[in-house]
Design a protein with these regions (language model features):
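Phosphate/nucleotide-binding beta-alpha loop and adjacent structural elements of enzyme active sites
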Residues: 1-233
Length: 233
């Protein structure tokens, strides 16, 4: 079992097909995760970034298809707000000071799969600044049947009231055949979801995942502590 952390997203690498895997990078930012998937998985990557400034920086390399769209529960348009002094993806906070707004096309994962004729999606990476709840609430069981794994960053560290909703979503995903593996301590900032239809999760896999979780969690805590000490210095 090979678990790797890429930009604080845990991926079960050897559960991904070795031949022509498909990855959806939702909340692609500047494309670092998408580029990793191309280089290390040999994947064809569909990279979606809502912010046009960030979308313009997505790499132009073979097998990487960039799109300036927001991932949402349904197709349409969205008006988003971002802080002028920083670049982030997706669900921009309208209560921030010194902001600017823009309108962007929004797409559902189901319509994207249909448009591109994707029979199977090996990996969906979701990091869309809070919009992941709406997206997962609107995903059908028939869509999930075509997905191998999901690596999701929920944003309950910004809004703790999301946690009951997140727990309910994860229960539904379990009922749809996914093994739910929260990697983060105390929060849902890194959740790996594995579809049992395509990858069995045995007892020793669960032990390996638990070991990885605590090792990674300790490393993250130490890294944040060191960063705070460095800033104070």
């Amino acid at each position: 079992m090979k678990l790797v952390e890429v930009l604080q997203h845990t991926i079960w690498v050897d559960a991904i097909r070795s031949a022509e895997p498909i990855v959806l990078d939702c909340g692609a930012n500047r494309g670092d995760f998408a580029r990793w998937a191309v280089d290390h998985l040999g994947a064809t990557v569909y990279a979606f970034e809502a912010d046009p400034i960030l979308a313009a920086t997505l790499p132009t390399v073979p097998r990487l298809h960039p799109y300036n769209v927001a991932i949402a529960g349904e197709d349409g348009t969205m008006q988003l707000t971002r802080a002028k002094n920083r670049c982030t993806s997706a669900c921009f906070n309208p209560q921030l000071e010194d902001t600017e707004t823009f309108t962007v096309a929004s797409r559902s994962l189901e319509s994207i799969r249909q448009e591109h004729g994707l029979a199977f999606i090996d990996l969906i990476k979701l990091d869309i600044e809070g919009a992941e709840i709406e997206v997962l609430e609107n995903i059908s069981a028939s869509f999930l049947a075509h997905v191998g794994q999901i690596s999701c960053e929920f944003h309950d560290f910004l809004d703790a009231t999301q946690r009951p909703i997140i727990r309910k979503l994860l229960q539904r995903l379990q009922q749809s055949g996914f093994v739910v593996m929260p990697i983060s301590f105390w929060r849902y900032g890194d959740v790996l979801l594995i579809n049992r239809r395509f990858q069995s999760v045995r007892l020793w896999d669960r032990v390996a995942i638990a070991t990885y979780k605590y090792r990674t969690g300790i490393q993250r805590i130490l890294s944040r502590s060191l960063s705070r000490v460095t800033r104070r210095g």
